């Protein structure tokens, strides 16, 4: 078997079904993975164009328009999605139900597992791998692995690392949404911590305190609503 056929057989594939108004009516587990999503609720009932960033929407619209054409050919395009480059093949459907399109998604290119080996554990698709620092003409970055905790700073935030703290132009709510929830947890309305950098837990009457792995052993408060969840994650 040649390399192309071998890679094609191993490539991750998924399927999306769309109604005539281009809302998603069904999704396969493979499609969720390729789109960098965990649950179908994030897709079902939503217009397919709204699920893509603005620069990609015209390309998706042309893809569907071509598939809907008089000759009804399957239309193809390669898009860079959160899970990586994906070949999308769109076909118009005819039937009694509400489904009007089938989109077949196939991962293209070498997988990270192939490049780095099966033991590598990449960050889930769509999550930040670096956090931006500073404001102005130059933006620097810190790897998420180096982030110890994040603190709200008005409409922005402050990133704490082993080397001190720096301004981040992203709001804490956006960071919560874009960081891997297996690695980061919002423990208080003003704080997100990297679970790998929690040094100790201190009880107190209301909530608790986390001792973080900084030189000074910074203390981060825990909101009462997060105490039970945090105890489970830290096995305490």
UniProtKB/Swiss-Prot annotation:
GO terms for biological process: nitrogen fixation; positive regulation of DNA-templated transcription; regulation of nitrogen utilization. This is CO-responsive transcriptional regulator RcoM. Disruption phenotype: Strains lacking this gene are not able to grow with N(2) as a nitrogen source in the presence of CO. Heme binds at residue 52. Signal peptide: none annotated. InterPro entries: LytR-like (IPR046947), LytTR_DNA-bd_dom (IPR007492), PAS (IPR000014), PAS-like_dom_sf (IPR035965). Binds 1 heme group per subunit. The N-terminal sensor (heme-containing) domain is covalently linked to the C-terminal, DNA-binding response domain. Activates the expression of the CowN protein in response to carbon monoxide (CO). Is required to sustain N(2)-dependent growth in the presence of low levels of carbon monoxide (CO). GO terms for molecular function: DNA binding; metal ion binding; phosphorelay response regulator activity. Its cofactor is heme. PANTHER family: STAGE 0 SPORULATION PROTEIN A HOMOLOG, TRANSCRIPTIONAL REGULATOR-RELATED. Keywords: Activator, DNA-binding, Heme, Iron, Metal-binding, Nitrogen fixation, Transcription, Transcription regulation. Residues 1-64 form the PAS domain. Residues 131-236 form the HTH LytTR-type domain. It comes from the Bacteria.
